[in-house]
C-alpha cells in the first residue's frame, strides 16, 4: 500500500498527468490569451503605488472591452470597499462589460471558539454589477507546475471558460 500511495501521489502521477495534458486535443490556444500585468513596471508607468484607485481598474475594463474579449479576469480580490465614487465607477464598468471575473480567496482562520476555511469574496456591489467570482489561489507541485485545482470552488479559469459555473 505504501508503494501504491507513492506511485499515485509522487513523480509517476506527475508524469501521467503531464502526458495526458500533452495529448489532450482540446487545449486552449495561448495566442487567444492576453495578460495585462500589474507589477513594478506598471506602478512606475502609472506613477502610482498599490492599491490603485478603482477608477483605474474601471478604465482598464472599459479599454479592454473595446476589443470584445471573451472575458476579463482580475487575479485581485477586491474584498474591501474603497471610496463610493471609485467603487461605483468600477461597478459601472463591470456592468457594461458583462464578462468580468473577479478573484476570491480561501484562507484558514483560527478563532477562539471556531476555526476553519473562510472565503474572501469581492464586495457585494461588484457582484451585483454582474461580476462572476472564481477562486484565485492554486498550489503548484514541487516542480512548480500546477496540476491540481480545488474541486469545491470555481477557479478563475473554470469561470472564464464557462465550465462548472451555474
Regions found by a protein language model. Name each.
Residues 1-166:
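Non-transmembrane functional regions of envelope-associated proteins
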Amino acid at each position: 500500500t505504501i508503494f501504491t500511495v507513492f506511485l499515485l501521489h509522487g513523480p509517476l502521477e506527475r508524469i501521467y498527468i503531464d502526458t495526458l495534458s500533452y495529448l489532450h486535443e482540446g487545449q486552449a490556444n495561448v495566442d487567444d490569451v492576453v495578460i495585462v500585468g500589474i507589477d513594478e513596471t506598471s506602478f512606475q508607468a502609472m506613477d502610482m503605488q498599490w492599491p490603485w484607485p478603482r477608477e483605474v481598474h474601471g478604465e482598464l475594463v472599459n479599454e479592454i472591452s473595446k476589443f470584445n474579449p471573451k472575458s476579463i479576469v482580475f487575479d485581485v480580490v477586491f474584498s474591501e470597499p474603497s471610496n463610493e465614487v471609485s467603487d461605483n465607477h468600477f461597478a459601472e464598468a463591470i456592468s457594461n462589460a458583462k464578462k468580468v471575473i473577479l478573484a476570491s480567496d480561501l484562507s484558514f482562520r483560527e478563532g477562539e471558539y471556531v476555526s476553519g476555511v473562510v472565503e474572501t469574496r469581492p464586495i457585494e456591489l461588484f457582484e451585483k454589477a454582474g461580476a462572476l467570482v472564481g477562486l484565485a489561489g492554486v498550489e503548484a507541485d514541487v516542480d512548480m507546475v500546477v496540476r491540481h485545482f480545488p474541486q469545491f470552488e470555481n477557479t478563475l479559469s473554470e469561470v472564464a471558460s464557462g465550465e462548472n459555473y451555474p
